[in-house]
């Protein structure tokens, strides 16, 4: 299209606006409103994303697409994801059914901002952060992640659990029935009355998986015998759909109601979503694991994983989202809990429900990490450089 033809086109469209003015005058329509609408249709550029976000900010909950097709609906649906708004394509049969069917009540997905932490005052006068994870488990939104060898030991796990945190006993070091039994006995002695821990089991290790959860079922048997275990974390791989559903039901049967899957890729997250869809009456906790820091079964960037799957995860009310991978400061943890991290990418806030702390916990008092390594962890600065799969920087 030449510059001349563009100019001619604009002139003709502007003339069309004038024609609308004439029609409005003849038919008694609001001339100002009619002209404004015509200008937006013919000659004025429209930032549709900004317009929709402005509607959301003004408190609008529904958009009615008057047609003639559902084009505007298809353009708008991605924009309103996470904003707590709905759109109805009134020119389609489905849209008309939702509008005119007696008793029909179209629903709106909750705004993602509704998942942000809220302050809650406890009976002792203290104020804590309330998230979907804290309401589900009764624990802090800061979790001690399972990692071999640090949380193979009972003391650090018990210390975290006694302080009100989710605390994972790493199955990577519980390599025989005798060692497992001894560790559970030690934990039972160290834990305060009413406290419990969670067991982290490596799905990728056939021997350990069969010993602990899948075959000999040491974890389930221990729970049935009164062991203080109320959660199982499936890490380093995701079972197939049928096996996962059977596992969830079995764990619920023995009193383990916190079932966690720890995906490290988009495909694995989608697998967990399918699992959650199959068990709508069971809570499924997802530990989305990025590849930063150490000890993770992921080579992916955490933000990329969340941006690709957050909307799908939030479609399921039985899914609770925790994240980890290089979150080493309170400030960074707060960005994920509040969801503000997503603003850097031009998205609405995407709050998560809990934060996994792993590598940073290696420097704690209770960790059996050597003093020299603890000091090195404290002194070593992080890097903003992303190291992809199969690559290395500085050795």
What are these regions (language model features)?
Residues 313, 317, 337-395:
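Conserved active-site-proximal phosphate/metal-binding subdomains
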Residues 30, 98-104, 111-113, 138, ...:
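Extended charged low-complexity segments that act as oligomerization/scaffolding linkers
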Residues 1-109:
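Acyltransferase/transacylase module recognition
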Residues 1, 260-271, 327-338:
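Active-site glycine- and acidic-residue-rich loops that bind
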Residues 105-317:
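Active-site entrance/lid segments in N-terminal catalytic domains of soluble metabolic enzymes
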Residues 56-59, 64, 161, 225, ...:
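Non-catalytic positions within long, well-ordered alpha-helices that form the structural scaffold/packing
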Residues 148, 318-337, 358:
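Glycine-rich adenosine-cofactor-binding loop
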Residues 1, 55, 63-67, 160, ...:
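Conserved small-residue
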């Amino acid at each position: 299209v030449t510059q001349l033809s563009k100019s001619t086109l604009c002139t003709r469209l502007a003339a069309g606006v004038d024609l609308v003015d004439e029609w409005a005058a003849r038919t008694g329509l609001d001339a100002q409103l009619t002209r404004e609408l015509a200008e937006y249709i013919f000659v004025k550029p429209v930032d549709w994303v900004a317009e929709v976000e402005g509607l959301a900010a003004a408190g609008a909950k529904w958009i009615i697409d008057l047609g003639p097709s559902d084009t505007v609906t298809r353009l708008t649906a991605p924009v309103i994801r996470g904003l707590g708004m709905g759109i109805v394509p009134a020119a389609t049969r489905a849209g008309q059914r939702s509008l005119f069917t007696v008793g029909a009540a179209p629903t709106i997905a909750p705004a993602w901002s509704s998942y942000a932490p809220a302050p809650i005052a406890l009976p002792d006068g203290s104020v804590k952060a309330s998230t979907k994870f804290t309401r589900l488990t009764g624990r802090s939104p800061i979790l001690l992640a399972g990692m071999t060898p640090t949380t193979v030991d009972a003391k650090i796990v018990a210390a975290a659990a006694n302080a009100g945190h989710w605390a994972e006993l790493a199955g990577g070091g519980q390599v025989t029935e005798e060692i497992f039994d001894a560790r559970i006995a030690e934990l039972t002695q160290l834990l305060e009355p009413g406290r419990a821990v969670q067991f982290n089991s490596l799905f990728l290790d056939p021997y350990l998986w069969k010993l602990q959860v899948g075959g000999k079922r040491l974890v389930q048997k221990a729970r049935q015998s009164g062991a203080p275990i109320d959660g199982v974390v499936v890490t380093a791989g995701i079972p197939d759909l049928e096996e996962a559903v059977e596992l969830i039901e079995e764990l619920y049967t023995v009193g383990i109601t916190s079932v966690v899957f720890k995906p490290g890729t988009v495909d694995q997250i989608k697998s967990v979503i399918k699992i959650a869809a199959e068990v709508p009456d069971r809570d499924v906790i997802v530990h989305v694991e990025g590849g930063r820091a150490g000890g993770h079964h992921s080579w992916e960037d955490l933000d990329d994983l969340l941006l690709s799957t957050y909307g799908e995860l939030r479609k399921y009310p039985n899914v609770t989202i925790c994240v980890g991978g290089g979150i080493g400061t309170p400030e960074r943890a707060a960005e994920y809990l509040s969801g503000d991290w997503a603003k850097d990418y031009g998205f609405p806030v995407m709050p998560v429900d809990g934060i996994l702390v792993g590598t940073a916990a290696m420097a704690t008092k209770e960790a059996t990490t050597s003093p020299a390594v603890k000091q090195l962890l404290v002194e070593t600065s992080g890097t903003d450089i992303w190291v992809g799969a199969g690559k290395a920087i500085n050795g």
